[in-house]
């Protein structure tokens, strides 16, 4: 798109406008294209994700998937999750990045205030822009899924632990669980 080709490993910033050196209008076009249903449905699963999440659900843990995707991407995102055997996991879209410009009162859309009213003891995050949001949850352990765009980011505090894949995420979860029993 726009004649720009940046390999995945070279995506240095979560802010794609900065990574690809885009104009405001190019960035808006990219964000729209990236959230078209056909594009969302074609994303590959990160190895081990559905297996690990389903393991936690099978163990009786309450699991939610909370994304900063636009509110109108809920249906294709829900469909993708269902196709990847995550139909038991509720999905919520939260305006984490201030991109939503109109109020939508769907049960699966949350404001930041609604999100902060929830309680979590474990989170998995890869967006440096969202680290601040998960910092609100007292006592929450945060597994930071290493990505090229977050690897250079300083972690906010010792509740944040870097993980290379879902096996490491699950180990961090198991250690947290062992400490709680």
Where are these regions (language model features)?
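Active-site neighborhood of HAD-like aspartate-dependent phosphohydrolases
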Residues: 1-31
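Short, acidic loop-to-helix structural element flanking the phosphoryl-transfer center
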Residues: 36-64, 71-78
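Generic beta-sheet signal
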Residues: 66, 94, 145-147
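Substrate-recognition "cap/lid" segment bordering the active-site pocket of phosphatases
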Residues: 71-124, 128-135
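Short acidic-hydrophobic, aromatic-tinged amphipathic segments that line or gate anion-handling sites
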Residues: 92, 159-171
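Short, charged, surface-exposed secondary-structure boundary motifs
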Residues: 99-105, 151-158, 172
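Acidic, Mg2+-coordinating phosphoryl-transfer loop and its flanking beta/alpha structural elements
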Residues: 119-164
């Amino acid at each position: 798109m726009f004649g720009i080709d940046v390999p995945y490993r070279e995506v240095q910033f979560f802010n794609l406008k900065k990574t690809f050196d885009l104009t405001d209008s190019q960035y808006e076009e990219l964000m729209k294209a990236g959230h078209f249903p056909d594009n969302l449905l074609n994303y590959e699963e990160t190895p081990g994700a559905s297996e690990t999440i389903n393991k936690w659900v099978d163990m009786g843990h309450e699991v939610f998937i909370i994304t900063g995707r636009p509110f109108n991407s809920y249906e294709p995102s829900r469909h993708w999750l269902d196709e990847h055997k995550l139909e038991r996991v509720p999905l919520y879209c939260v305006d984490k990045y201030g991109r939503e410009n109109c109020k939508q009162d769907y049960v699966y859309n949350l404001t930041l205030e609604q999100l902060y009213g929830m309680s979590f003891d474990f989170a998995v995050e890869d967006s440096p822009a969202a680290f601040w949001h998960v910092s609100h949850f007292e006592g929450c352990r945060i597994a930071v899924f290493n990505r090229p765009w977050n690897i250079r980011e300083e972690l906010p505090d010792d509740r944040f632990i870097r993980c290379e894949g879902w096996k490491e995420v699950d180990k961090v979860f198991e250690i947290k669980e062992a400490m709680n029993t």
